[in-house]
A protein has these predicted regions:
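N-terminal signal peptide c-region/cleavage motif recognized by signal peptidases
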Residues: 21-23
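A short, acidic, amphipathic alpha-helical segment used as a generic capping/interface helix at domain edges
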Residues: 139-148
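Bacterial N-terminal signal peptides that target proteins for export
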Residues: 2-12
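Generic beta-sheet signal
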Residues: 42-44, 151-159
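A short, structured loop/turn motif at beta-sheet edges
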Residues: 148-153, 186-189
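Active-site-proximal alpha-helix that buttresses catalytic centers in soluble enzyme cores
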Residues: 28-120, 127-130, 136-137, 171-186, ...
């Protein structure tokens, strides 16, 4: 009986420590500390799609699978998306869920980065090619999603600048093409900004 009680006490203590750790506010991180944190998981990465011309391509210059002639990545966007994905794999950063805008340029970013098992999410979309407005329901979905921190992996959301700036004006007014916000728990049930990573910085991160 005593042995069983001691075992239960140890289990309860371990659960309390785990919950406390997950509720503790995340710290601003960079360099090795950032990579180490991402390797342990528990973060949500919100990324703008890689570099894309503002004009949709003509039929002659469109990618073969871009049947709707949507905006697509330029050469720099394609190269940096590939490099980002390669860095994530080489750094052994675990990726769990991946959600992406259904736009072609976002899907192309995810495909070239080879992010695992992506799912399109309408709320991450751009409200049409004009980018003139993002519905409040989209911003609410994004704000809620970034508070759902995974255990042992990281969630990636690929979307657009108006969505990110609209949902998180306290952290950012604009992002460069492909830039990522790394969000962690704020200790109060919400999210806080841990780091900003420009897409060209991923290959320079080391562990």
């Amino acid at each position: 009986m005593k042995r069983h009680l001691k075992g239960s006490v140890r289990l309860l203590a371990a659960l309390i420590l785990l919950l406390t750790a997950r509720q503790a506010p995340a710290q601003t991180l960079s360099g090795d500390a950032l990579v180490n944190a991402l390797r342990h998981g528990g973060y949500v990465l919100v990324a703008r799609h890689a570099s894309s011309p503002r004009e949709a391509p003509a039929k002659q210059s469109a990618n073969a699978d871009n049947v709707n002639l949507e905006r697509q990545l330029d050469d720099n966007g394609r190269a940096t998306a590939v490099a980002m994905g390669k860095a994530l794999r080489e750094l052994k950063i675990p990726i769990g869920e991946v959600f992406t805008s259904p736009t072609y340029r976002a899907l192309e970013t995810v495909r070239l980065a080879q992010l695992p098992n992506p799912r399109t999410q309408a709320e991450l979309g751009d409200d049409g090619q004009s980018m003139q407005g993002v519905a409040e329901s989209q911003l609410a979905w994004l704000r809620k999603k970034v508070t759902q921190f995974p255990m042992g992996s990281n969630t990636i959301l690929v979307t657009h600048q108006p969505n990110i700036a609209g949902a998180f004006p306290q952290w950012v007014s604009s992002l460069s093409d492909g830039e990522t916000l790394v969000l962690g728990p704020d200790g109060k049930g919400g999210a806080t900004l841990v780091a900003r990573i420009k897409i060209e910085q991923w290959p320079n991160l080391k562990f």
